[in-house]
Structures are given as structure tokens and as C-alpha cells.
């Protein structure tokens, strides 16, 4: 299993390839706010663990294993963003909160959160009831 740091790199590489068609060491460094030398070290480790194929000065490509993991990690991130949005977390906190929790949840927990998100997507009345429970709204009952 990849470490949380490895997951961050795989997710970012997958995302870059999906949006730009490629991922360069400099792009990854810019996106993750790290030095290119740190990216090179991690890319070499990911190559050794068969998540990608890296050739110095030529770039990198994800292996099927890396592509599958990258897709799953990106979906996990989006799912957690949806969940936090549904439960009323302030949008300005969502990205940071997801970054803080995504590596600490089991895949079983992620699947259950997916069930909750799907439930609220399929039951707008239940979502409306949940939104009405928002503690930040002033109590209008007297």
C-alpha cells in the first residue's frame, strides 16, 4: 500500500495527466509546493513500486496499477468534498479538511461515506431536512 505522501503524488500525477495529457517533474513540484528534487526522489520510488515508469529527462507515465490508484484517489477526494459540502461545511474549509482526513480513512469508511452521499443525492427531501438542521442559522422558533 502506498504511504499518504505517495498517494498525494499519485493523485496529483493522475490529475495532471487527465487535464494536460502529461505530468512533468516541474508541474508536479508546482502543484504540490515542493522542490523538483523531492519530486524526482518520489517519482523514482513510485517507479520502483510499479505505479509509474520514469525515464530521466524523458518524463513519466502511469502504469495500469498507477492509473487505477490515481483514479481511485481522485474519486475519493471528490467524494469527501461532496460529503463535507452536503453536511454543511463552509466551502472555504472543504479542501483543507479533505486533505487532512483523506489518508486516515479506510476504504470501507470511504465506501460508507459514498453510500451517504448517494442517499442524499437520491433523497432531496432528506437533504433539505439536513440543511434545516444547520446550527449556524438563527433559531426562528419562539
From Swiss-Prot:
Keyword presence, Cell wall biogenesis/degradation: no
Compartments reported by the entry: Cytoplasm
Organism, as annotated: Listeria innocua serovar 6a (strain ATCC BAA-680 / CLIP 11262)
Similarity comment text for this entry: Belongs to the DtxR/MntR family.
Binding site for Mn(2+) 1: 8, 99, 102-103
SUPFAM superfamilies assigned: Iron-dependent repressor protein, dimerization domain, Winged helix' DNA-binding domain
Single Gene Ontology MF annotation: DNA binding
UniProt keyword list: Activator, Cytoplasm, DNA-binding, Manganese, Metal-binding, Repressor, Transcription, Transcription regulation
Keyword Transferase in record: no
Binding site for Mn(2+) 2: 11, 77, 99, 102
Its biological purpose: Central regulator of manganese homeostasis.
GO biological process assignments: intracellular manganese ion homeostasis
Record-level GO cellular component terms: cytoplasm
PANTHER family: IRON (METAL) DEPENDENT REPRESSOR, DTXR FAMILY, TRANSCRIPTIONAL REGULATOR MNTR
Name of the molecule in the record: HTH-type transcriptional regulator MntR
Record entry for activity regulation: DNA binding is strongly activated by Mn(2+).
Self-association and partners: Homodimer.
Residue stretches making up the HTH dtxR-type domain: 1-63
